[in-house]
């Protein structure tokens, strides 16, 4: 469905309802380990004057390059799904910034709405590395780094971003499990994609586990419809010690609940909460579509009859603030 994501990216901006509290925003680019640009959006508390601003495919009232307000600020990094972009969780980033967090979201080189040309194995290997590269920048080079509480780093990942998060917090894929699962459940969404044949090859399963980059700086994670979760080595999952919150949809046929969220619930030792969202489809976890996008009847904009995506997203954002406030507090 990558073409749907690309099409959504060029639709009219979505204007997000604002509440009290000023938010600053910075847009910049840093190189990954191969020199390709990683696009970043950074939201943070600010006392500077705000103005309506277009940020890619969304519009928000923010203080572009405004001064940072506060010290010892916790940070949450956002990881988009396949062929996404840094604005995919822009409303969540805004809400977290208003609540006193720094929120940073990246666009993954080789797996985004403009360029998804990397091969699937390379994408899955690169994503955790690029995530760590962003954390390196934020904590070592970003001009606002002295405002951060560097021991309070959270992660949010959707779909392929959920896979990225599982690797980052210590999980190791065992690709021998992939063809076994797909043979038993061929209707699993990722088993029907073109990449399934690649991930089922013996040479993929034989790749060394040392290729997967973990990042111990992440202290709490929210994983939403985490893709390929059933292919993770249970023993590696059992060693993950940080708190994790899991979300999935009862009508998600791309990343079905039981074989992914349910699988992780069985093996992760510190699952704080599991949310099986009634009537939610895979794309129900993305921000609400603009009217122009909905008029095109895109699958990415389609929800079950009666499912209120706007109300659900507001509830999800409130929970993100609650979870990260609770689990990132160093004095809890």
How should each PLM-predicted stretch be described?
Residues 236, 242, 256-266, 289:
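Short alpha-helix in the alpha/beta-hydrolase fold that links the catalytic acid
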Residues 240, 246-248:
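Short beta-strand/loop motif that positions the catalytic acidic residue
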Residues 267-298:
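Catalytic histidine neighborhood in serine/cysteine hydrolases
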Residues 291-332:
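Catalytic active-site module of serine/aspartate enzymes centered on a nucleophile-bearing elbow/loop
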Residues 157-161, 165:
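Gly/Ala-rich beta-loop-alpha elbow adjacent to hydrolase catalytic centers
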Residues 120-146, 150, 167, 176-194, ...:
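Alpha/beta-hydrolase active-site loop
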Residues 21-78, 88, 273:
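Domain-level recognition of soluble alpha/beta enzyme cores
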Residues 50, 65-73, 78-115, 230, ...:
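Short substrate-entry loop that stabilizes the transition state in hydrolases
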